[in-house]
Amino acid sequence: MKFSTIALPLLASAALAQTNSSHSGTNATSHNSTVPNENSKTTIVVTNDDSWASANIRAFYDELKKEGYNVFMFAPALQQSGTGGTFVLPKNTTLAKGAEWGSAPVGAPAWGQDEKDDHIWYFDGTPGAAVTFGFDYALPKFHNNITVDLVVSGPNEGWNLGPFVYTLSGTEGAMYTSVLRGVPAIAFSGENKHTYYANASNSETASHNIYAKASTAIVKNLLKNAKGRPSVLPYGVGLSVNLPLVGDIDPTGKCTDPKPIFTRQTGRGAITDKLVFNETTGLFKYGDIKSDATKACLNGDCFLPDETDVINNWGCYSSISVVSTDYDAPGALAAEAQFLNRGLVEFAPTGYGSFPGN
């Protein structure tokens, strides 16, 4: 199945701003060499929050391998949706509950490999912990401490739209955990059901197969345009991609070729959560709410559409938002907040800043 490359060249030119060449990784998994050329293999780590046995991650892994990449999977043993960037490690040396869908039995080691593919690993922890297990244990101990060129997380079984869900999602959490380690990363999210890969359809119109191809097309284009650079993406920057309803889950039945466009997280469609009390059950549930803060544009290109609006209303388009792990407020807004704290809070003496020369 051929996928459209509309907007993909733009992805490389806009998101691949010049990397700070003075930065170099200090451990084996931080990116500390140039992006490989065509005559050498690119190493990609795949992770997610829906478990190592989900149809989405297995289809993505297989598709990346078809392209000739050197691919490893380090993913949670069990479903870990909604864990954000939390870092939960195994409490025992064995699996108390087994792995998702019985893909590893109760009592199996808390981390282990697929019996048919030693590049596929599960880990009894959250997504951020699982990908770090790859960086700090599995790759150094069993795979010659190979340098990772890119981490891809997902595709998630559910959209991750807007700034609130960005902090909540385990898929996004694995992405920004990797970015903070100096490893370029992309989070992918779709909207299909939790499906065991062994029971998944092989049809070309199956959503997991379309998501795998669409995600791989974005990865392939990005790596092609990044050849010879110090890093696939600028340090501290990641991509958050949301894929629309496609194939067998698309009500129109027409979307098999989602077209990627640039978006931002905040905007007119962006939402956050609120509590809603149910008088019948006496319990709370969550609902959606918009605020001035979800619409605010403080960083980035304010003329881009927001990802929530694009995915909910634009049809067969994928949203690609460029995100940063530098959470400090922009200079003018930071100065205003600092001014409002005058009289008590002081600035550090000259020479105590975070960057050379401060």
Curated annotation (Swiss-Prot):
Which gene underlies this protein? PHO2
GO molecular function, a single term: nucleotidase activity
Q: Which reaction does it catalyse?
A: a phosphate monoester + H2O = an alcohol + phosphate
Q: What is this protein called?
A: Acid phosphatase
The domain of life for this entry's organism is Eukaryota
- Could you tell me what this protein does? Probably serves to scavenge phosphorus for growing cells.
Q: Write the signal peptide boundaries.
A: 1-17
Listed cofactors = Mg(2+)
Species of origin: Yarrowia lipolytica (strain CLIB 122 / E 150) (Yeast)
> By its UniProt entry, which NCBIfam families does this protein fall under?
surE
The record's family statement is: Belongs to the SurE nucleotidase family.
User: Keyword Transcription regulation, does the record have it?
Assistant: no
Q: Write down a Pfam family by its short name.
A: SurE
Q: Where is the active site?
A: S189
Q: Which GO terms describe its cellular component?
A: extracellular region
